[in-house]
Amino acid sequence: MRKIYFVCLMVLGLSANATIQDYDLYIVSDSLNLIDNSKLPYKVFTNSASFQGKNVIYNINEGDTLRLNVHNTDSDIHHFQVKGMAYPATIIPANDSVIVEMVFPDAGSYIYYDPLNYPDNKSMGLAGMINVKDHSYSSFYWNIKDFQKSKSLNIDAGNVEVWNDYYPNYFTINSKSNPAINADTDARVTGSVGDTIYIYMVNTGQSIHSMHYHGYHLEIMHSSHEPSHVGRIKDTFPLYPMETLVLRLIPDKPGEYPVHDHNLVAVTANMVYPNGMFITLLIAD
């Protein structure tokens, strides 16, 4: 095991309540069960050595240190990196582990991923989210992905993939599609009229997704792609590959309202509608 410290230098003004959050993280390979009962070769970052369908979602506070003991249970070398953090990728040999340590001084959402042979390993599933909070409001988390099944099978077979002809045919939030996604308590937005609700979104796929909210307008609190858009209030939010958004919702009426990708092919699973990127908000009086 190697121990590697990466400390962000922008530490002025960090909270006196900042803590060190320490976790084990495992790279595990298996298959993802898709909504049409087919399987997709898949790799994930999990919190145990057993396969779990979705990547771990980390939630920490502004100024906290995140210390991860990353175990590679796979037979291949993998890398670990957090997009936007100023340090190189960490190499993790097969059946070995490393410790990485990072300080997060700024609130927002960050993507951790495997950049090796980019985007192959990331497209096989190895990309998750780290959410850095400056509030204590109810929060929900969406890790958005898209897959072209034939490419996943080709990479899994050890072949070289070409990405200039990418046509994804499966689309997930937290590794689930409609209707299964509504059973995911991390993703399914619930609350009451007048609540303050935060929605953290990362796009770890290869396509742009334009997420459209019915029923409400939301405020942009963080945008990695367009920081100047913070404060804008609207109902549709483009989310570019490997970029992040944090939105704030204060519901003004009760009801159940859909959220879906405006690129309607992403609301399908292998062209079956609406088995893709479609979820509902459930707001009580």
Give short role names for the model-derived ranges:
Residues A18-P88, I99, V132, I155-Y198, ...:
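N-terminal, post-signal-peptide metal-ligating segments of extracellular/periplasmic oxidoreductases
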Residues L218-F237:
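Intrinsic, low-complexity N-terminal interaction/targeting segments
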Residues V28, V202, H212-H214, H262:
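Generic beta-strand/beta-sheet core signal
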Residues I197-M211:
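Long, repeat-rich segments with strong aromatic
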Residues I4-L14:
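Sec-dependent N-terminal signal peptides
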Residues S75-H78, Y87-S150, F237-D285:
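Extracellular/periplasmic metallocenter environments
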Residues Q81-A86, I208-E219:
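Short acidic, flexible loop segments centered on an aromatic residue
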